[in-house]
Design a protein with these regions (language model features):
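N-terminal Rossmann NAD(P)H-binding glycine-rich loop of SDR-like oxidoreductase domains
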Residues: 4-21
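Conserved Rossmann-fold NAD(P)-dependent oxidoreductase catalytic core, especially the SDR/UDP-sugar
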Residues: 79-124, 147
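Mid/C-terminal beta-alpha module of Rossmann-like enzyme folds, strongest
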Residues: 194-252, 281-291
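Glycine-rich "substrate-gating" loop/helix at the edge of Rossmann-like oxidoreductase active sites
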Residues: 152-159, 178-189, 211
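Catalytic helix-loop patch of NAD(P)-dependent Rossmann-fold dehydrogenases
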Residues: 72, 107-154, 175
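A conserved pocket-lining segment of Rossmann-fold NAD(P)-dependent short-chain dehydrogenase/reductase
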Residues: 63, 168-186, 190, 194-197
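NAD(P)H-binding glycine-rich loop region in Rossmannoid oxidoreductase-like domains
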Residues: 37-87, 101-104
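Short alpha-helix in the Rossmann-fold core of NAD(P)-dependent oxidoreductases
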Residues: 71-78, 94, 128-129, 184
Length: 291
C-alpha cells in the first residue's frame, strides 16, 4: 500500500490523478490538501510515502507586476512543502514542472527538445518552475527521492485550455490552412498512469512523458469537425496567411509551430499509454467562443 498526499486540492491534474489511483484502493490510499493559507501544515505528513505536488500558478501570459507572486507560489511554496515532507519522513516528492522551462516559443521557428537541450526559460513562469526544480534537487538524498515531471500541454475532459478553443474553431470555420506540424501533448489519463508507475517503481529524476503520437493541428481540426458533423475545406492556399498572421498574432505560432520532445526522451521501462491520441479527443468539450 502506497499512501499518497496530493498538495493542490481541486486542481484539474490533481483531481484526475486522485481518481486514477483510487481505481486500485488495495494499492493506493490518496488524500488531498489545499495549499492556501498554510492549511497543508495541518496535514499529518508522517502518514504518507509520497507527496504529489501540483499546486502552482499556471502560465496565462501574466503581467510583469505579478512576477513576485509566481516565484512565491511556484518556487518558494514548492520548496517549503518539500522540506516539510522530508522532515516528516516522506520518501518521494513528485513535482509537476513544465516543458516551458526550456523556452516559450513565440515565433514560427518553434522548438524541438533533445536530450542535450538545456533549460532556458524566457518568461518568469518558466523561470519560477526551473528555480523550484533546482531547489528540490538540493533536498534529494537516499531516503528522499525527487521526481520532476516536465510535461507538454496537458488536456482532457474538463480542462479549459487551448484545445477546447481549437475545437470551437473547427466547428465554425468553413476553411483551414493545410499547415501540418508536430506538437507534444499529454492526455491526463496517460499522465495519471505515468505518475502511478513512478510511484510503483519509486523512480527519482527528471521525466518527459508525452502521448505516443505527436499532435498535428490540422488533424486535430479535422477530427473535431468530423465528430461534430461539420464540413471543412483544408487547403494549402491559406498557408501564406499563417506566415503573415504569425507576425502580428501571438496565437498563430502557438497553433501552427512545431513544439515537441523527441520520442526517445519519453520512453521508460513501463507502459503508460492508456489512450490513443484520436480516442482522447472524442467527447472533449468545445468552447462556445475563442475567448
Amino acid at each position: 500500500m502506497q499512501r499518497v498526499l496530493i498538495t493542490g486540492a481541486n486542481s484539474f491534474v490533481g483531481t484526475n490523478i486522485e481518481k486514477w489511483l483510487m481505481k486500485e484502493p488495495e494499492k493506493f490510499a490518496v488524500d488531498t490538501v489545499d495549499t492556501m493559507n498554510e492549511v497543508w501544515k495541518k496535514a499529518d505528513f508522517t502518514k504518507y510515502d509520497v507527496v504529489f505536488h501540483v499546486a502552482g500558478i499556471a502560465h496565462v501570459d501574466p503581467k510583469p507586476e505579478l512576477a513576485p507572486l509566481y516565484y512565491k507560489v511556484n518556487r518558494d511554496l514548492t520548496i517549503e512543502i518539500a522540506k516539510w515532507a522530508k522532515e516528516h519522513g516522506v520518501k518521494q516528492f513528485i513535482y509537476m514542472s513544465s516543458r516551458i522551462v526550456y523556452h516559450a516559443s513565440k515565433s514560427m521557428k518553434g522548438n524541438i527538445t533533445l536530450p542535450t537541450t538545456q533549460p532556458n526559460p524566457n518568461d518568469f513562469y518558466g523561470d519560477s518552475k526551473l528555480q523550484a526544480e533546482n531547489g528540490l534537487r538540493e533536498l534529494e538524498c537516499d531516503t528522499f527521492k525527487i521526481s520532476i515531471i516536465r510535461p507538454p500541454m496537458i488536456y482532457g475532459k474538463g480542462n479549459k485550455g487551448n484545445l477546447p478553443r481549437l475545437g470551437w474553431l473547427a466547428t465554425k470555420t468553413p476553411v483551414f490552412p493545410a499547415w501540418h506540424n508536430k506538437r507534444s501533448m499529454l492526455h491526463v489519463n496517460n499522465l495519471a498512469e505515468f505518475v502511478k508507475q513512478l510511484i510503483i517503481h519509486k523512480m527519482g529524476g527528471t521525466f518527459y512523458p508525452q502521448n505516443s503520437e505527436y499532435a498535428d493541428t490540422v488533424e486535430i481540426v479535422r477530427l473535431f469537425a468530423k465528430e461534430h458533423g461539420h464540413r471543412i475545406w483544408i487547403t494549402r492556399l491559406l498557408n501564406p496567411l499563417v506566415w503573415l498572421g504569425a507576425k502580428f498574432l501571438p496565437a498563430v505560432p502557438k497553433m501552427f509551430s512545431d513544439s515537441y520532445y523527441v520520442k526517445e526522451m519519453s520512453q521508460y521501462p513501463f507502459d503508460y499509454q492508456v489512450v490513443s491520441f484520436e480516442d482522447s479527443l472524442k467527447g472533449l468539450e468545445i468552447r462556445k467562443s475563442m475567448r
